[in-house]
Amino acid sequence: MNKKQKKMLKRIIVASILFIIIKVVKLPEYIEIPLFLVVYLEIGYDILLKAFKGIRNRQVFDENFLMAVATVGAIGLKSFDEATAVMLFYQIGEWFQSYAVGKSRKNITELMDIRPDYANVEDEDGNLEQVDPDEVEIGTIIVVKPGEKVAIDGIVVEGSSTLNTAALTGESLPREVSENDEVISGCINMTGLLKIKTTKEFGESTVSKILDLVENASSKKSRSEAFISRFARIYTPAVCYSALALFLLPPVFNLIMGNPADFGTWLYRALTFLVISCPCALVISIPLSFFAGIGGASNQGVLVKGSNYLEALASCKYVVFDKTGTMTQGVFEVAGIHHANIPEEKLLEYAAMAESYSTHPISKSLLKAYGNTIDKSRIENVEEISGHGVKAVIDGVQVLAGNDKLMKMYNIPYQECHSIGTIVHVAIDGKYAGHIVISDMLKPHAKEAIEALKKAGIKQTVMLTGDVKSVADKVASELHIDKVYSELLPQDKVNKVEELLSLKHSKENLAFVGDGINDAPVLSRADIGIAMGALGSDAAIEAADIVLMDDDPLKISKAIKIAKKCIHIVYENIYFAIGVKLICLLLGAIGIANMWVAIFADVGVMIIAVLNAIRALNVKNL
């Protein structure tokens, strides 16, 4: 609890004790009434002040105004105990709401407790000095001792250790790191001493981007939140005017009919109507539900950029995957080399050198298989041809390395290969030199992930890939993916997603899942863009609506289940709050419901709705 909450709790306790004493002990009226007024002012003075300021600033219609009018009116009718009770229970509800929101924020802060407080930097004498991470420049060597957080992204230059990435990924399995491995901020060093050369400033590091993402998520409102905001703006003035009509019209009608006006009875009913009508339960619990849902998701390594995306994900019926790095490991290995008119080693050397400037996983596998240091001085005029391959001049000869489309582009006859895998054809000075077969492994949970998506209510799964049809069909068959589209260029993937979007129902959403490396256009075109394996990937965090911090495809169904649970809670609160209020408003208007029922309809409903909203935090076992 903060100071404000503690102070309010003391006021509530004092007011409650005094209220109970006054109700239990039979006191003369001339003592009882002043005591009730003292308790009323002690617990409600701030509400009265807020209502007065609202009137002065011409922002009349809010819950403070409703409570002030209702309780002052009750005092005017000499219902001192009910006026005090309404104000007391309203303040109890407000305190509980404040505490619940604060508690959920604290939980989320603890779950996302990844911000490092300091970085260790060696001074000129070799002594460690703790400095603010913001002060550390790129290229600085920082020292991370066991038990400390990695402060800034970088590369290990000395030492080996295991890192706990649970706060980022939701997974407890530690990650082994040693010299030349990349590490990201927010991880906890568990065993050995590490010296890390920073590759980013703190403001651009992974931990900063994640914290910004989580903190700014509340600024992107869902349709449900926007509806509640609009509803409250119309609803509050409407019930105020309805209460005024309830107070004036029946007595006037009675007078016209020659009956007693009975203004006191109708004023009491109008005041009861006002207390019941307070929209706190909706205004508070709906944003809290989304806030808790986003916080619970972040604990599981699912970062949602706004409640609008969480709401959209709950209506997701189609999931489209990129193959490489999403359903497969993206760790390619050379499975075979078929040479034509040059030695096998020379074919691999030419292919590796031509691809040496590319960051594509296939290029990395060729470099790994080649195993030697690349002499970049031998390579000239490198040109990457999107969706086809690479053209380069190596040792004065022109080398083409890529798929069959590249061979067709340059009218080079090539040998068909029926091996399962990605085929890299190589041509030297316009003559076919052979091809290299590269295979990719499925991710361990890929098949389970597709099954889990079907159980989560996904109608259709689709896989898009630039790979050849034989490889794509084999992967889709193994994983039981419904549809597969192969041999696609990057622009073809965007067109295919647009085609799929045009075929779906307007109330159904389509999610695209990619590894965030080359998928930015498709991620932004889908209803929901999901980047997975984003640990350390700036591009993924920027491009996607939802970011999965590790490589486990099972997290996709987890994210959908979290979204559905959150939206289910939101609608529970909407139906419950509106339903109870409508019934009580009707009972209040006809005189059956009194102030005590009104207190339940306001404070009781709010507390129940807030408690229900907090359930959205609990997503671990989904």
Language model feature labels by segment:
Residues 19-122, 135-142, 149, 160, ...:
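Actuator/coupling domain of P-type ATPases
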Residues 334, 338-460, 469, 481-497:
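P-type ATPase nucleotide-binding
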Residues 12-16, 227-257, 272-290, 571-600:
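Bilayer-spanning, highly hydrophobic alpha-helical transmembrane segments
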Residues 242, 504-507, 544, 549-622:
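Membrane-embedded transport module
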Residues 1-31, 38, 101, 110, ...:
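Flexible metal-binding regulatory segments at protein termini and peripheral loops
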Residues 68, 168, 268, 278-354, ...:
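Conserved catalytic phosphorylation-site environment of P-type ATPases
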Residues 52-60, 99-109, 288-307, 614-622:
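Juxtamembrane helix-loop transition segments at the membrane interface in multi-pass membrane proteins
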Residues 396, 422, 428-572, 580:
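Conserved ATP-binding TGD loop and adjacent catalytic N/P-domain core of P-type ATPases
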